Amino acid sequence: NWFFDNVCIPKIIEFKEIFKSGGGHFNQAIFNNDVPYIMNSFWVNFQKQHEFNPLHNHTGLFSFVIFMKIPYDYREQRMIPHVKISNTPCAGDFVFVHVDLMGKICSYSYPLDPSCEGLILFFPSKIRHLVYPFYNCEEPRISVAGNVWFKSKK
Protein backbone atom coordinates (compact mmCIF):
# COMPACT_ATOMS: atom_id res chain seq x y z
CA ASN A 1 0.00 0.00 0.00
CA TRP A 2 1.06 3.61 -0.48
CA PHE A 3 1.66 4.43 3.19
CA PHE A 4 3.77 1.34 3.81
CA ASP A 5 5.85 1.79 0.64
CA ASN A 6 6.32 5.56 0.91
CA VAL A 7 6.51 6.11 4.66
CA CYS A 8 7.33 2.88 6.53
CA ILE A 9 9.95 1.46 4.15
CA PRO A 10 11.96 4.74 4.02
CA LYS A 11 11.81 4.91 7.84
CA ILE A 12 13.06 1.31 8.07
CA ILE A 13 15.93 2.18 5.71
CA GLU A 14 16.73 5.28 7.77
CA PHE A 15 16.64 3.23 10.97
CA LYS A 16 18.91 0.60 9.43
CA GLU A 17 21.48 3.24 8.44
CA ILE A 18 21.55 4.73 11.93
CA PHE A 19 21.73 1.47 13.88
CA LYS A 20 23.40 -1.05 11.55
CA SER A 21 26.75 -1.01 13.37
CA GLY A 22 25.54 -2.15 16.81
CA GLY A 23 23.50 -5.00 18.20
CA GLY A 24 25.39 -8.03 16.91
CA HIS A 25 23.26 -10.95 15.70
CA PHE A 26 20.03 -9.09 16.47
CA ASN A 27 20.85 -6.31 14.01
CA GLN A 28 22.19 -8.75 11.42
CA ALA A 29 18.81 -10.49 11.35
CA ILE A 30 16.75 -7.31 11.33
CA PHE A 31 18.85 -5.29 8.93
CA ASN A 32 19.48 -7.93 6.28
CA ASN A 33 18.36 -6.27 3.03
CA ASP A 34 16.70 -9.50 1.88
CA VAL A 35 14.25 -9.60 4.78
CA PRO A 36 10.76 -8.52 3.67
CA TYR A 37 8.54 -6.47 5.98
CA ILE A 38 4.77 -6.16 6.24
CA MET A 39 2.44 -3.79 8.08
CA ASN A 40 0.66 -6.16 10.45
CA SER A 41 -1.74 -3.77 12.15
CA PHE A 42 -2.99 -0.21 11.80
CA TRP A 43 -5.44 1.69 14.02
CA VAL A 44 -6.72 5.13 15.03
CA ASN A 45 -6.73 6.43 18.62
CA PHE A 46 -9.32 8.99 19.73
CA GLN A 47 -8.56 10.22 23.23
CA LYS A 48 -10.69 12.64 25.23
CA GLN A 49 -9.42 14.85 28.03
CA HIS A 50 -8.41 12.88 31.15
CA GLU A 51 -7.82 9.71 29.07
CA PHE A 52 -4.35 8.27 28.75
CA ASN A 53 -2.54 5.26 27.34
CA PRO A 54 -0.48 3.62 30.11
CA LEU A 55 3.07 2.32 29.76
CA HIS A 56 3.14 -0.43 27.13
CA ASN A 57 5.00 -1.82 24.15
CA HIS A 58 3.89 -3.45 20.91
CA THR A 59 4.30 -6.69 19.04
CA GLY A 60 6.32 -6.88 15.86
CA LEU A 61 9.59 -5.29 14.84
CA PHE A 62 8.81 -1.59 14.42
CA SER A 63 5.90 0.61 15.48
CA PHE A 64 4.84 4.11 14.56
CA VAL A 65 2.52 6.85 15.70
CA ILE A 66 1.32 9.78 13.61
CA PHE A 67 -0.15 12.73 15.48
CA MET A 68 -3.17 13.80 13.43
CA LYS A 69 -4.89 16.24 15.80
CA ILE A 70 -3.37 17.84 18.91
CA PRO A 71 -6.08 20.18 20.24
CA TYR A 72 -4.01 21.59 23.12
CA ASP A 73 -0.65 23.24 23.73
CA TYR A 74 1.76 21.62 26.16
CA ARG A 75 2.77 25.10 27.44
CA GLU A 76 -0.82 25.74 28.54
CA GLN A 77 -1.07 22.23 30.00
CA ARG A 78 2.02 22.93 32.14
CA MET A 79 0.24 25.94 33.71
CA ILE A 80 -2.73 23.92 35.04
CA PRO A 81 -2.39 24.06 38.86
CA HIS A 82 -2.13 20.31 39.58
CA VAL A 83 0.34 19.90 36.69
CA LYS A 84 2.38 22.99 37.56
CA ILE A 85 3.18 21.72 41.07
CA SER A 86 4.32 18.31 39.82
CA ASN A 87 8.02 17.47 39.83
CA THR A 88 7.42 16.02 36.35
CA PRO A 89 4.92 18.24 34.52
CA CYS A 90 4.10 16.16 31.45
CA ALA A 91 0.37 16.54 30.82
CA GLY A 92 -0.43 15.63 27.21
CA ASP A 93 3.08 14.35 26.41
CA PHE A 94 4.06 11.23 24.46
CA VAL A 95 6.93 9.58 26.35
CA PHE A 96 9.43 6.81 25.62
CA VAL A 97 10.77 4.94 28.68
CA HIS A 98 13.97 2.90 28.65
CA VAL A 99 16.73 1.63 30.92
CA ASP A 100 20.26 2.97 30.42
CA LEU A 101 23.45 0.91 30.60
CA MET A 102 23.67 1.45 34.36
CA GLY A 103 20.10 0.29 34.98
CA LYS A 104 18.62 3.75 35.50
CA ILE A 105 15.08 4.21 34.22
CA CYS A 106 15.09 7.11 31.75
CA SER A 107 12.43 8.84 29.73
CA TYR A 108 12.28 11.00 26.64
CA SER A 109 9.22 13.23 26.27
CA TYR A 110 7.61 14.69 23.19
CA PRO A 111 5.67 17.73 24.43
CA LEU A 112 2.72 18.06 22.05
CA ASP A 113 1.01 21.07 20.52
CA PRO A 114 -0.74 21.70 17.18
CA SER A 115 2.64 22.10 15.43
CA CYS A 116 3.17 18.35 16.00
CA GLU A 117 0.24 17.44 13.75
CA GLY A 118 1.65 15.23 11.02
CA LEU A 119 4.71 14.25 13.08
CA ILE A 120 5.61 10.57 12.68
CA LEU A 121 7.53 8.73 15.40
CA PHE A 122 8.97 5.43 14.13
CA PHE A 123 10.58 3.16 16.72
CA PRO A 124 11.41 -0.44 17.68
CA SER A 125 8.18 -2.08 18.85
CA LYS A 126 9.59 -3.24 22.17
CA ILE A 127 10.44 0.28 23.38
CA ARG A 128 7.99 1.04 26.16
CA HIS A 129 6.01 4.24 25.83
CA LEU A 130 2.96 6.03 27.19
CA VAL A 131 0.72 9.00 26.51
CA TYR A 132 -0.24 11.28 29.39
CA PRO A 133 -3.73 12.75 29.77
CA PHE A 134 -4.51 16.31 28.76
CA TYR A 135 -6.97 18.68 30.45
CA ASN A 136 -9.34 21.63 29.86
CA CYS A 137 -9.99 20.75 26.21
CA GLU A 138 -13.18 19.23 24.79
CA GLU A 139 -11.68 18.21 21.43
CA PRO A 140 -10.15 14.73 21.06
CA ARG A 141 -6.47 13.99 20.53
CA ILE A 142 -6.27 11.85 17.39
CA SER A 143 -3.37 9.65 16.37
CA VAL A 144 -2.81 6.82 13.93
CA ALA A 145 -0.55 3.94 14.95
CA GLY A 146 0.64 0.63 13.58
CA ASN A 147 3.13 -2.21 13.72
CA VAL A 148 5.57 -3.56 11.14
CA TRP A 149 6.60 -7.23 11.18
CA PHE A 150 8.83 -9.52 9.20
CA LYS A 151 6.80 -10.97 6.34
CA SER A 152 6.17 -14.68 6.87
CA LYS A 153 7.39 -17.09 4.18
CA LYS A 154 4.07 -18.96 4.38
Question: Residues of each region from the PLM?
Answer:
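Compositionally biased, intrinsically disordered low-complexity regions
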Residues: 24-26, 94, 148
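Double-stranded beta-helix
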Residues: 145-154
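Signature of the catalytic double-stranded beta-helix
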Residues: 1-61
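Catalytic core of non-heme Fe(II) oxygenases with the double-stranded beta-helix
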Residues: 40-122, 130-132, 139-142
